[in-house]
Regions:
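Cys-dependent protein tyrosine phosphatase-like superfamily
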Residues: 1-96, 108-204
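Ser/Thr-glycine-rich phosphate-binding loops at phosphate-binding pockets of nucleotides
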Residues: 101, 105-106
């Protein structure tokens, strides 16, 4: 499973690079958290770079467009996400998950899936914060104050949501795997589906 900025929406001038890297990694299925199918068609019509690889996946039914907003605590977000995760169950990887920047919506979804597969707080945080280093040069070594502020404001809210901890509640002893399961089962995903999803994401 990979995450990136959009490989098709080039508003930040990253799409050609994201698409090239995803293709080189052998990505076979894309979970597009940001766009509608109509928006994807519009990107094809206005593309100023080679969209052949992305369009071949799309035409084969290997791109799921979820059109999520950034409110991962909202019911609509969770319902739409589950629809996309069911598509992952039905398709072989490697998988690419992206929104526009690959930061907010993608950061939450990847942390949720990492938690589901048994990742620790530190593992989820370290993966999430790579984005802030890539975009803004914010990392623990060179800019610890800003790094800690982003973790406190952004990532810890994600961690609380996944763990089912109230806003500003303590994360001590949080069970992220159990919380991730509950986040998904609360909107109708079955235990069988969750286990199949984990199998897809962790198989070699």
């Amino acid at each position: 499973m990979y995450r990136s900025a959009s490989p098709i929406d080039n508003q930040n001038n990253r799409a050609p690079y994201a698409a090239d890297l995803a293709q080189r990694c052998g990505v076979q299925f894309i979970l597009d958290l940001a766009d509608t199918n109509e928006e994807i068609q519009g990107y094809y019509q206005n593309a100023d770079y080679d969209i052949t690889w992305h369009k071949s996946l799309y035409d084969a039914g290997n791109v799921a467009a979820l059109n999520l907003n950034a409110n991962y605590r909202g019911g609509q977000y969770a319902y739409r996400l589950v629809a996309g995760l069911r598509e992952i169950i039905l398709h072989k990887g490697p998988y690419l998950i992206h929104c526009t920047e690959g930061k907010d919506r993608t950061g939450f979804v990847c942390a949720l899936l990492e938690a589901l597969c048994g990742a620790s707080y530190d593992e989820m945080r370290d993966d999430y914060m790579i984005t802030y280093d890539n975009y803004y040069g914010i990392n623990e070594k060179d800019d610890k104050a800003r790094y800690d502020a982003v973790v406190d404001v952004k990532f810890d809210d994600i961690a609380r949501c996944i763990a089912g901890v109230p806003t500003y509640g303590s994360l001590d002893g949080a069970d992220y795997a159990a919380g991730a399961r509950k986040y998904l089962t609360d909107v109708g995903m079955t235990e069988w589906e969750i286990n199949k999803l984990i199998e897809r994401l962790t198989s070699k």
